Amino acid sequence: MRLLFIFLFCLLSITFVYGDTKTVHKNPGSDKGANVVYPVPPISNERLFYVQRTPNANTIVYDLNLNSDGKLNTEQPVKVYWLKYAEKGQKEELNYIQRKFAYGLTAKALNNGNYDIRFVSYKKFPLTLMRTGDGKYHIFALIAQKQVILNRIFVKIEGGSFWLPNVMYVEVKGSDPLTGREIVERFKP
């Protein structure tokens, strides 16, 4: 009976802190950091994808950057910010070092109206921002040898330093634009 009470208390605590318990990710890999809950950021019409990583639930969000008239900001088409779930869940801008050396993006306009998007810290993973037939913008990536809509990236880090973290793997998740089926790939950068 006591164990049941403890289990229910923990379940209710998670629900209170993060909302619906169905909107969380478990830590892929589940060894160090297995007790970290990775909430799914709130749904937004501008959401492109988000990145989560050990050692905490703080999430880096990548949204479409629209001007006040609702059109794409062609100079900086993606805005990047934190959701600090490990604190109070507040939204915060990336600092200069995070933006220029870690989680920021570069964007280069292509002739066809699309954008070549790259992480400043890992340029070997090309992304493409493009408008699809439904008129919405999405970030596309090559995942498991398929061009899919990128939804989430999880980075498993064990040790190292800020400037040179020991990345065990990167897990990328996306959805097939034709079937909606989830596609997942894990790689070591």
What do the predicted segments below correspond to?
Residues 20-94, 182:
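N-terminal export/targeting and maturation segments
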Residues 39-42, 107-110, 163:
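Structural signature of eukaryotic scaffold interfaces centered on beta-propeller domains
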Residues 107, 128-129, 156-164:
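Short linear motifs in intrinsically disordered
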Residues 82-150:
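Mature extracytoplasmic domains of secretory-pathway proteins
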Residues 20, 188-189:
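Short, solvent-exposed mixed-charge patches
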Residues 149-157:
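Short, solvent-exposed, Trp/other aromatic-anchored flexible loops in extracytoplasmic proteins
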Residues 160-185:
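Short, exposed beta-strand-loop hairpins at the edges of beta-sheets
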